[in-house]
């Protein structure tokens, strides 16, 4: 439908216009909905239409103008901010410059502080190294060998000073014999004190060696006692294991007796169930016989009903034939309306009779169907009861089998638990023995490692001491070579400065006697100072002699 400006001149024009619209719907699209009566359409001029449209769209145009103005202002503001962003003669620019200058000053101060911290750390590290070196030097000077070496150094210097004083006194007073004798006595006394001191040190070394031997013997006795205790513990563990096995055998025998008794009771219960099942089966057979008799009677009644129905049908057919014959005779004899009415009445009576017979037949059929449904329901109930009884019997049997299985599983779990406990006890004993052996081996290894580290530390300390002593001896020997014997004696290895072999296994001990090998066994000495056991003075005194 197309509406144009102007007035209509008639229906034919509208029809032609409709035809054109139907032929070309694309060029002139409809401006109004379909099925609109053009007589109800108001036609307005174009100016009026523009005025109405402007009045309707004025708010939208004003809102669009406002949005455009706000957008233009915002864009101008952003451009202004972008332009003045890097200006330095504004408050924001000066503030940013001050912040950057402050940040730069803070970074410089932080860099200076870091440099000072690094220098302080380096200085403290150097101080710590100096303190560590001083402590090491002090600790080195506090060792026994260094003290003995310093004592020898002091003795050497004292002897040198003493000789110098003696020479000075000799050059000053050559005629004083008494002074010389006194000096000689002092020297002899000093040598005597030295010999006594050496003898005392020798006795101390012998006592120390005896103490070491005693400690070694005590360690061996302790090891033997520990080994005996371990053997005793092992025997006790074996005895406990044998007692445990005997007890477990007793428990297993008792469990077997309980299992046999449970099995006997179970078989008795099964026998009773079989008897009950036979009685129930006999009762079920009797009930089945009754049902079969009932079904036979029902079948006989059904057969009789069918025979009666067939007889009834035969009688009806005979009567229908008689009636048809009678009607045919009447039709032949009379063809008037009265005969037709009578025939119609007879047909209606026959139809009514057939209807009653059919209803009776339907009723009998419904009764027979109800009887069959009742019989099927009874049979179904019997079958359902039988199935339910079989299901209950099966469930009861499964419950018994499940209980028996649970019982055997419980017994198996108990046996497994007992075996597991026995294995755990055995494993615990084995682990304990292995732990003892491992601890002993670990202790031995730790002792060996300790001895090795001790020997390495002793070797390092000995090297450091020898270097220090060599430097001191070389510096002292430059002035005089006469009094460096105490220094050489203090430098010699081994306690007491012995001349025997170095015993590595005994902590670097160097005995003061000759030995055959590194074991330290003393060789026989042919020049004995005297008999050790033949004291003739005691023998003569015991015999009564006085000379």
Curated annotation (Swiss-Prot):
Its main location: cytoplasm. InterPro entries: CFAP210, TPH_dom. GO terms for biological process: flagellated sperm motility. It comes from the Eukaryota. Expressed in trachea multiciliated cells. One of its GO terms (cellular component) is sperm flagellum. Keywords: Cell projection, Cilium, Coiled coil, Cytoplasm, Cytoskeleton, Flagellum. It is found in: Cytoplasm, Cytoskeleton, Cilium axoneme; Cytoplasm, Cytoskeleton, Flagellum axoneme. Residues 184-254 form a coiled coil. Residues 210-237 are annotated as: Disordered. Pfam families: TPH. Microtubule inner protein (MIP) part of the dynein-decorated doublet microtubules (DMTs) in cilia axoneme, which is required for motile cilia beating. Microtubule inner protein component of sperm flagellar doublet microtubules. This is Cilia- and flagella- associated protein 210. The lineage of its organism: Eukaryota, Metazoa, Chordata, Craniata, Vertebrata. The gene is CFAP210.
């Amino acid at each position: 439908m197309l509406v144009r400006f102007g007035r209509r001149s008639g229906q034919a024009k509208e029809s032609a216009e409709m035809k054109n619209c139907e032929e070309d719907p694309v060029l002139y699209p409809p401006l109004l909905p379909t099925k609109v009566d053009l007589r109800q359409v108001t036609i307005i001029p174009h100016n009026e239409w523009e005025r109405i449209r402007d009045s309707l769209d004025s708010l939208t145009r004003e809102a669009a103008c406002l949005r455009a103005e706000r957008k233009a202002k915002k864009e101008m503001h952003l451009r202004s901010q972008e332009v003045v962003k890097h200006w330095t003669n504004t408050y924001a620019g000066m503030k940013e410059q001050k912040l950057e200058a402050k940040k730069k000053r803070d970074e410089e101060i932080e860099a200076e502080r870091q440099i000072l911290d690094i220098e302080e750390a380096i200085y403290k590290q150097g101080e710590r190294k100096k303190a560590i070196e001083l402590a090491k030097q002090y600790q080195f000077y506090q060792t026994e060998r260094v003290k003995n070496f310093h004592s020898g150094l002091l003795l050497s210097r004292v002897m040198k000073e003493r000789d110098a004083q003696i020479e000075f006194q000799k050059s000053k007073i050559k005629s004083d014999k008494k002074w010389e004798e006194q000096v000689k006595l002092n020297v002899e006394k000093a040598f005597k004190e030295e010999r006594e001191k050496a003898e005392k040190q020798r006795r101390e070394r012998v006592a120390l060696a005896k103490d070491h031997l005693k400690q070694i013997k005590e360690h061996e006795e302790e090891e033997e006692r520990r080994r005996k205790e371990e053997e005793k513990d092992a025997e006790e563990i074996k005895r406990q294991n044998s007692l445990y096995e005997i007890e477990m055998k007793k428990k297993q025998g008792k469990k077997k007796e309980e299992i046999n008794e449970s099995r006997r009771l179970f078989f008795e219960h099964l026998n009773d169930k079989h008897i009950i099942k036979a009685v129930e089966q006999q009762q079920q057979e009797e009930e089945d016989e009754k049902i079969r008799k009932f079904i036979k009677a029902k079948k006989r009644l059904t057969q009789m009903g069918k025979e009666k129905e067939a007889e009834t049908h035969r009688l009806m057919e005979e009567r229908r034939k008689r009636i048809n014959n009678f009607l045919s005779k009447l039709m032949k004899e009379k063809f008037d309306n009265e005969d037709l009415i009578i025939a119609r009445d007879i047909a209606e009576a026959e139809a009514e009779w057939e209807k009653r017979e059919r209803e009776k037949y339907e009723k009998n059929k419904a009764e027979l169907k109800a009887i069959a449904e009742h019989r099927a329901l009874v049979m179904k109930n019997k079958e359902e009861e039988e199935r339910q009884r079989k299901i209950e019997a099966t469930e009861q049997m499964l419950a018994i089998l499940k209980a028996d299985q649970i019982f055997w599983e419980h017994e198996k779990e108990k046996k497994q638990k007992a075996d597991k406990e026995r294995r755990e006890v055995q494993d615990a004993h084995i682990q304990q023995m292995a732990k003892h052996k491992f601890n002993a081996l670990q202790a031995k290894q730790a002792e060996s490692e300790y001895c090795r580290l001790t020997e390495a530390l002793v070797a390092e300390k000995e090297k450091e001491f020898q270097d220090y002593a060599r430097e001191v001896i070389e510096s002292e020997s430059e002035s005089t070579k006469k009094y460096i014997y105490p220094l050489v004696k203090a430098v010699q290895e081994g306690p007491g400065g012995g001349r025997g072999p170095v015993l590595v296994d005994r902590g670097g001990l160097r005995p003061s006697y000759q030995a055959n090998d590194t074991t330290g066994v003393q060789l026989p000495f042919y020049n004995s100072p005297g008999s050790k056991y033949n004291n003739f003075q005691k023998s003569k005194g015991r015999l009564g002699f006085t000379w």
